[in-house]
Amino acid sequence: KSDVQFFRIVASSFVGGVFLTLCLVGCGKSDVVSSSEDEPNIDIEGNELVEIEPDRSLILHNPFTEWVTYASIGDGASTTYWSDYDNMHTSEGSVVKVSDYSNTLYLRGAWADFNPEDGVYAWEDECTTQASKRLKGFMEEAEKRGMKLAFTFVVDSRDKHDNFTPAFVKDAGAKGYETVTGSATVWSPYPDDPIFQKYYEKFIYALGERFDDPDKVQFISGTGLGKWGEYHTVWYYGTKVEGKEELPIRESVFDWATSLYADAFKRVPLLINFHRWIGTGRDWVNESTYDEDTERLIGKAVEKGYSLRHDAFGMHPYYGNWEREFAQKWFYKRPIIMEGGWVVGTHRYWTDSEGKYREGHPEDVRNGEFKDAQEAHVNMMDFRIGNETETWFGKSFDLVKRFVQEGGYRLYPSKVSLPTTMENNTSVTLVHYWKNIGWGYCPTNMPQWKNKYKVAFALLDTKTENVKFMFVDDKPEACDWILGNEKEYIF
């Protein structure tokens, strides 16, 4: 069964107690495919043309599109999360459920919370930590609301007040370093350390056994390394302590981490962060400076099946010309999802380099994020958590609804040429035309979605509407349906 929204076209005549329907299914035979940029090929004797107007306002809850809601299982997490998110006030004066607009619950948390002891995992019944209880609660509530899960598992403790790598990894002899966040001294492992890699591999494979399920999980963000799990400012033992050249170590770790996730997750889409300093040990320099090996390395991850995410949309210059140009190179080859960069409750967002944000006006930031997302043709946008979510709904609800109407992918059959009558033991010709009115695309060219969604015509029982016969047109690919184009297929 496909979880892509079904579209039904009823023919004007019925044959033998069945009627014709058109749908997208999870995996037939096509004669010709052509572009309808030329004169439509609809003059078929005995056929009738059905033209369809799209419903732009319906929230479809389709896979790998729509808004993403964030949550935390760590200490300090909200105890009123669902009551708050089920009663969100909007700038229109209404009160809505966030989950009505979002089909993904994203948990970005510490490896230590998901794996508190060697061989003990937070999703298991035997684990009774507070983080485990929160995780199980979120999983249960997400399922009630028809939301899929998504994850990032962070190992780096910098900029945190707790250790994000489990204590047993350090106790086993993994090499690492201490940093100070406020009054807290925290420890992070070097990702080129073999003891760290041994335990992280064990954890990721355990995750794959439990969560490599596309019916339950929307995506996994790999690799969890660097600051915030975004592959920023990565420090290596070989470089920091032994003084070796960074690139060979950096590339070796990158290859190891991306291959690890790709081996553990074969059915759920994987994401890799893109920014100009992937895996390097340095921080931001300026808008015109970038690492020359970054684009090549990200390309290696994409070849392994990764799609793309960036976590500073609307935050300039960190989402700058390099990032924009990089995203453009991957339009419709791999889907892109976004996360905003500015935290409007604590950051001085009005200092943004583009000079378009006013102090005291978080809606300016929301508008900047929206414009960057539209330009990048993203499939998914983020509500994030707390004040970010509140300002999306309370200050910029019009943009929340616009993304539902315009963002991601919205597929529909714009015209279908159908036979008015059919006889048994004869052949008929159908012509169908498809449009996408979203700025993203349906990523059936991701390896995890290979042959997952196909167009099919079916004959249904008029009394029960059960499928009696199904005919799959294997030529159309939904990833080819791009905003502004209409595709024609003869079947």
Model-derived regions, located:
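A beta-strand/beta-hairpin structural motif
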Residues: 468-491
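Aromatic-lined substrate-binding rim segments of carbohydrate-active enzymes
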Residues: 94-179, 250-269
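Short amphipathic, basic-aromatic surface patches that mediate peripheral association
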Residues: 434-448
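Aromatic- and acidic-residue-enriched segments that line the glycan-binding/catalytic groove
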Residues: 158-182, 232-244, 286-292
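Catalytic cores of secreted or luminal carbohydrate-active enzymes
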Residues: 365-419
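An active-site-proximal structural segment forming one wall of the substrate-binding cleft
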Residues: 131-143, 172-221, 253-260
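Bacterial Sec-dependent N-terminal signal peptides
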Residues: 20-48
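Catalytic-core regions of glycoside hydrolase
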Residues: 44-91, 143, 221-229, 234-387
